[in-house]
Amino acid sequence: MPKSYTELYFPILLQAVIAMGLAAGLLTVSYLLGKKVRNRVKDMPYESGIVPTGDARHRFSVKFYLVGMLFILFDIEAIFLYPWVVVYRDLSRNGSLFGFYEMLTFVILILSGFFYIWKKGALDWGEPTARPGRK
């Protein structure tokens, strides 16, 4: 006999309540017991243990943004592979290779996009050098 949704999801709800309660409790104890000393050193921004110097308003090369966008693009495409991997056994159980060919097409499109941006030089950081076959 199947259990009700309340019985099925009660452990998850209990875990969430315990996690939030533990986090709130630890933050409260830290706030109540911690010292409240404010000085110039504590008010400085922390940057990997290095004392910050200069102004934070510098121009960044567009290549940083390009690489960031390409990373997000290919990362999301890699995330789309995960559900396919999970259900692949069910897709191929009846002997059909449709799911395999569908994902093979998807991977070929991803790789062709990757080779296209590589060929266009979107991943080159240095000054362009004279390479054979490249203008």
From Swiss-Prot:
Subcellular localization, as worded in the UniProt entry? Cell inner membrane
Family annotation (PANTHER family)? NADH-QUINONE OXIDOREDUCTASE SUBUNIT A (PTHR11058:SF22), NADH-UBIQUINONE OXIDOREDUCTASE CHAIN 3 (PTHR11058)
| Membership in a protein family | Belongs to the complex I subunit 3 family.
Q: Show the GO MF annotations.
A: NADH dehydrogenase (ubiquinone) activity; NADH:ubiquinone reductase (non-electrogenic) activity; quinone binding
Under Enzyme Commission nomenclature, its number is 7.1.1.-
- Taxonomic lineage from the root: Bacteria, Pseudomonadati, Acidobacteriota, Terriglobia, Bryobacterales
Keyword Flavoprotein applies? no
What this protein catalyses is: a quinone + NADH + 5 H(+)(in) = a quinol + NAD(+) + 4 H(+)(out)
Protein name listed in UniProt = NADH-quinone oxidoreductase subunit A
> Which Gene3D superfamilies does the protein's record reference?
NADH:ubiquinone/plastoquinone oxidoreductase, chain 3
The record's gene field reads nuoA
Task: Note the subunit structure.
Answer: NDH-1 is composed of 14 different subunits. Subunits NuoA, H, J, K, L, M, N constitute the membrane sector of the complex.
Which keywords accompany this UniProt record? Cell inner membrane, Cell membrane, Membrane, NAD, Quinone, Translocase, Transmembrane, Transmembrane helix, Transport, Ubiquinone
**Primary location:** membrane
Q: Which residues cross the membrane?
A: 9-29, 67-87, 97-117
